[in-house]
C-alpha cells in the first residue's frame, strides 16, 4: 500500500544517512511514519478505554515501544493519548539515557526496561498466560521488574537511530574515523572488527550476501581476507576503503517522479550494503527478529495491534511471513494432512500491503526513505 511513487530499492536508500548527508540539530532522530502508526494503532488503544471513549484519551490502555531509541514514537503516543500508560524497551544504555531525558515530562506514565526486546517479551509474557480477570501476566526471569498488563498496542521500529550513525562513535558510519565496533549492546562479546578479522572467507561472503543482499559479497570477502593478512581491521574507514576498491559505484536513486514530486539521492557509497550486513551480524538482528515477532504477538491482549517498521527487504520478508501465518485460517504445517488447529485465524491483517512514507516525509527525512510499515491485529 504505497502512499506515493516508490521507485528506489530499500537497500540503496539507507546510504544518505550512513554517508552523513542528513543534517539534524543536536544529533536528533526523526521518527518515521509517526502519523501512520498513530492512526493504525488508535482502534486498539481507544477501544480499551474504560468510560473514556468520548475523550479518546487512552485510559486503561497499555502501549509498549519495543525499540525505544531516543523516544520519538513514544513521545508522540503519550502526547496523543493523555491517559495512556507506556513502557519502553531499549538495549543501548546511551540511547535509554537520551530517551529518559526526552520523556521526563511524562513522569510515571512511562516505565523503562534496559535489555533486548525479544528477551523482555519472552520473559515477561510467554512464561504464563494472562489472567482473564486482570489482564496481567506474571513476569519471568531475566531481571524484568514486576508484572506488566497485556498491551493493547506494540510498536517495533527495526531501524538504527541517527545518533548511532553520527554520535555513538562505534563505527556504524563510514563517513568518519571510528573504531569498528557496531554493538548496540556494549556488553556483547563480539565487535564488527572481531568478525572481519576472524571469520573465514566463505563465512564472510555469506554474511555480506545474507545481511546486505550484496551481489559482490564474494569479492568483498576476498578483499577483506587479503587486507587482514597485512594488518587487522580496526576502523570503520579502513573497512569502507577496502570495499570501495572492489565494488563499483552505485547509481543515483530517484523517487516520486510519477506523482510530480522528484527526489534525488546522492550516489551511494559502495560500502553501504556491506556495513549494513556487518551491523546485522554483530547484533544478530535477523536471528532475533522471528523470536521478537512471536513473543510480541503472544504478549498482545485480544484485539491488540502490533506495528512493525522495517528498513530492508530481508526484514520485511520475515515480518510478512509471520503476519500471513498468523492470519491464515489453518496454521498447521504443510506436512500435516488433516487440520488439527481448529481452522481459526489468530489475527487479522490491518495492512494487506506495507505502507511506505509519503513523498513529503521522504524529502524531509532521508532516514525514512526505505521504511515500510505492517500492522496486524490479534483476535
Curated annotation (Swiss-Prot):
Transmembrane segments: none annotated. GO terms for biological process: rRNA base methylation. The keyword rRNA-binding does not apply. Coiled coil: none annotated. Its EC number is 2.1.1.199. It is an enzyme of class 2 (transferase). It holds the Pfam family Methyltransf_5. Keywords: Cytoplasm, Methyltransferase, rRNA processing, S-adenosyl-L-methionine, Transferase. InterPro entries: RsmH, SAM-dep_MeTrfase_MraW_recog, SAM-dependent_MTases_sf. GO terms for cellular component: cytoplasm. Its main location: cytoplasm. PANTHER family: 12S RRNA N4-METHYLCYTIDINE METHYLTRANSFERASE (PTHR11265:SF0), S-ADENOSYL-METHYLTRANSFERASE MRAW (PTHR11265). Belongs to the methyltransferase superfamily. RsmH family. This is Ribosomal RNA small subunit methyltransferase H. It comes from Treponema pallidum subsp. pallidum (strain SS14).
